[in-house]
Amino acid sequence: MNKDYNMIKFISEIGLNHNGSCEIAKKLIKQSKEINCDFVKFQIRDINQIYHPDFLKDFSNSENANQYIFNEIKKAHISKRDYLSLFKFAKKINIKVMVTPFDLESLKLCKRNEVSAIKIGSPDFDNTQLIISALKLKKALFISTGMAKDKDIDAIKKVLKKNNIFKVPITIFHCVSSYPPNEDEINLKYINVLNKKFPDYTIGYSGHERGYLPSLISIYFGSSVIERHLTLNKNSKGPDHNSSLTKSEFGNLIINSRLITDQLNHKKISQKKFLSQFKLLPAKNSIGEQIKTVSLNSEFNKKVLSKSAIYRKNFKKGKVIEVKDL
């Protein structure tokens, strides 16, 4: 558990919830500042780096889930120039910028002075090339584990230990890559395990549940950073709106977290007693067990959102493949 519960940080994830509109993005940035979030986060993709040229020419033969995600990404496209404008707007109103780059080309934008931190999303948890390249930028690094099994987490621990030569501050997020997850998928107790696995790192919780109760309870189990999506309207079209928080909900999460941290700092309290104030039993609902499981929903989303190595073009037999060829 945390030694100081007053250090809880909050990340407002905009993601695709701007729907391709800079004006909506600015409203979300402003709201994030008004409710005292520490970071506002953007997702940046270069579809020419992520998708195979054949898919971009004609994706009608691909699986429906791939078609849906690709269409949503295209609808919510914002140019690099617009992102730079949004970075400057965030800096102007004094809220830190975090970026999730989905490819090496998008990572280049993270070199900007306006970008304070980088987050590696769950689909890229095992993308060691992206992680190592991000570490070289010497900025705080946040990594989500939503699609990872225990063995994957142990493997990435070795990668981080070997390659974090600049001693970049690292945060590991407990996460479930369902949008939204069922309560029995959330498994907040695994935050305890991550704190033991990574004693030198900060541990956080990246939530996609409806409402914010599990996010709030995550503090008890050792979360020092909480990330949630922010939306202007939960009924808006798009993949993340229905698992996002409104300004009012997010603000209440932050206010209530201060009450909980004050409670936990002043006295030790049993799990049963702590949960009883939320009318939850210790072994039910979102609490789970200290065992890492990847739900069927997360497995499905991993298949749709994660990457695989493919050739950029056809090569003659005997060609020695280099990184630039993939």
Could you tell me what each predicted segment is?
Residues 1-326:
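Catalytic cores and adjacent flexible loops of soluble metabolic enzymes
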